[in-house]
Curated annotation (Swiss-Prot):
Protein name: tRNA 5-methylaminomethyl-2-thiouridine biosynthesis bifunctional protein MnmC
Gene name as annotated: mnmC
UniProt record similarity statement: In the N-terminal section; belongs to the methyltransferase superfamily. tRNA (mnm(5)s(2)U34)-methyltransferase family.
MF terms in GO: flavin adenine dinucleotide binding; oxidoreductase activity, acting on the CH-NH group of donors; tRNA (5-methylaminomethyl-2-thiouridylate)(34)-methyltransferase activity
One Pfam family in the UniProt entry: Methyltransf_30
Reactions this protein catalyses: 5-aminomethyl-2-thiouridine(34) in tRNA + S-adenosyl-L-methionine = 5-methylaminomethyl-2-thiouridine(34) in tRNA + S-adenosyl-L-homocysteine + H(+)
Required cofactor names: FAD
Entry's EC annotation: 2.1.1.61, 1.5.-.-
Keyword check for S-adenosyl-L-methionine: yes
Amino acid sequence: MPERIEWLEDGTPYSPRFGDRYRSESGGLDQAREVFLKGCGLPAAWAGQPQWCVLETGFGLGLNFLVTWQAWKTDPLRPRLLHFVSTEAFPASAADVLRSVQVHPELLPLARQLHDQLWGLLPGFHRLVFEEGRVMLTLCIGDAKAMLREQSFEADSVYLDGFNPGLKPADSPDIWDLHTFKAVARCCRRGTRVATWTVARSVRDALAQCGFVVKKTPGIPPKRDNLQGEFNPAWEPKKSMLPGIRRQAGSCVVIGAGLAGAAVAASLARRGWRVVVLDAADAPARGASGLPAGVLAPHVSPDDSLLSRLSRSGVRATLQQAHALLDAGTDWNPTGVLEHCVDHARKLPAAWQSDWAEAAQDWTCLATSGQLAHCRLPASAPALWHVRAGWIKPASLVQAWLTTPGVEFHDHASVGQLIRQPDSWQVLDANGHVLACAELVVLAAGYASRALAEAAVPPTSPPLALQAIRGQVSWALHPPGAADALPAFPVNGHGSLIPALPLSGNANELAWVTGSTFERDNALNDLKPEDDSHNLDRLRTLLPDVAPGLTGQLEMGQVKAWAGVRCATPSRLPALGPLAAPNLWVCSGMGSRGLTFAALCAELLAARLHAEPLPLEQRLAEALRPQYGEAKLVSED
């Protein structure tokens, strides 16, 4: 459940858990500006910088974030990117966050945007994106110490906020103790500024032990003092604790113009890179990303597995991009998705039905009898309802990403060889003609990435563990009366059905799409009539009372097909990371979840290149490292 907040007669939010106000008696806005922003030398300190990272312990009601965002927005010398990383063990509801800002009307436009993204805050990291990707809030839900151990970046400013250190309940984590400050120090560079409102001796001593040099400064009446300082340890931090070096934006060649490649190109271009995207086809999204439409929905498992957690981060990232770039109803539709658990009943994690029930219901819950009836399924059918889900046309998302300023697309550019120069790469075609040169190359060409990587890395390096998987979907225009006979939302679980896909931007010309087949070790995209029969057979299992109204179209020759070749890894997780050659990366292996993972992987790649805060926990990010050897797929469940 969201943290319970009581509202005092003067409108001040109060925490029953901590027995303390969320704001200082002098006013939260003054404290945010004077104690934290000014205490860290902002906005002057970030002038002219490519990026700036603020770390906060204690998100509370988000006021410090909103004030920092406002300062960035109104500063002509602002950095290109503002990262704000905040930990919070007891997240408040979106409604309370918005209510708390009513007394500060100048912040309301920003607060409404924040409110709209404050959903589904289960334990872990949540990347919220504003200002077309230039302001990024990474909310880390959980104990500050544990959350910061999952991060890897250098903060430029640190806000130490929270309730009075003397009021901590016995069952709550302590964000003012030595171990928390050690975790904070691990995320600091020499010279990182720190600010807080408390001058408690225990806090000053703990900060000093962790390498912070602090001093008292005049406070806001009635408070006499605040605390300011900087990270300047008398020792050199261990190299193993240091994140990567913040590199400057440069030139990049991305090979492959599908979801993975276009997402990488857009993420790098937003950071100032000059990106050339090469593809052998005559247009973008001619490979697996040319699918007429795909279902976007999270994976669910009773133990909240690695794949489940990664899929939620990916779905959130894709939804943000779709809302910003695509036309709802034409390019995509967030209708929600019903998962009919045909093969076995999927159980929700136990915590989703108790402590985190409200946040979990923003993601997935048991399907209602009404939703089942809409699919002509019995009320006893095992099914889930994915709230933040729907269908997307992958090609539309690819096209939108490739229009990002700084991205240049070249078609008919078949890459034959990569040649390493002293400080760059030459990308050549099969005849040895130079297609492009850049300091960084990202392989995002699906299964073809394996051969390109093998030719570019030292011969002793093992091959990438990538497997080609052919898939075919079947589709047809709606027969008469189909609108009333079909569900209003996609259904998945044993194959899938997208019931109402507008074609060519015409909302009145609708088609249904079902599939897909799954043929391993086949890199050919030829169409097979027997695959259409297979897809319709699976649809009979998925939706027994809906399928008969569509299968007749197969007999009348009205069903059409599309086939493509996906690329997967043994773990069924994407392959993202550097290869055994300088400035050569791979972003591939997303299987049937390109829509889920492309945007997330692109942001993770950019974060690693620029030593930015990670968009997901370190242990999840590490699971995406490229795998090598033979590609033998494992089960998802």
